[in-house]
Amino acid sequence: VKIRPVEKKDAAAILALIKGKAEFDGCLSSLHATENDIAEAFFGSQPKACALVAEVDQQVIGIATYYNIYSTFISKPGIWLDDLFVFSQYRKMGIGKALMKELCAIATKNNCGRIDWIVARDNASGRAFYQSMGASIFEEVRHSRLDVAAIKNLASQPA
């Protein structure tokens, strides 16, 4: 297994992995990204995200997408892990852990105070995987979101 930073040539593979994650999460209908969107997000003039990929026999079979964050509480930068996904036939081979290990190396190099992400309550194997690496699972925290319609609605309201 080779873990490396994503390259522009990987855009189609990135999209296939993200589609696989959306299927795994049961939210494929929410996936609107295209290969061009991926190329722009990761390799455009102002990249929005980063990624590591896992390769087996020169085939991309796993991914960790992430971006930089900042914690005011600990006054340090951090990383938000957006997606961690390995195709099912390559699971239980240490590939997810290898991706996480490389992400931790990046976090250490950049003096990050933490890496954050979400994991579904019903994803028992994912929760166990993360806890096996020393992660804390915060049951009391709820993920919140404003979608595009809510953002536009709130932004257009009078002060």
Model-derived features: positions:
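Glycine-rich acyl-CoA binding loop
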Residues: A54, K92-M100
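A short helix-loop-beta-strand connector motif used in the catalytic cores of GNAT acetyltransferases and
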Residues: E40-V53, W80
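Conserved beta-strand in the GNAT
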Residues: V53, Q59-N68
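Conserved beta-strand-loop-alpha-helix junction that forms the acyl-donor binding cleft
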Residues: W117-G126, R145-V148
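A short beta-loop-alpha structural element at the N-terminal edge
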Residues: K2-A16
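Conserved GNAT-fold acetyl-CoA-binding loop/helix
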Residues: L15-A41
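Conserved GNAT acetyl-CoA-binding A-motif
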Residues: T108-I118
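Conserved active-site alpha-helix within GNAT-family acetyltransferase domains
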Residues: K97, K101, R121-E140
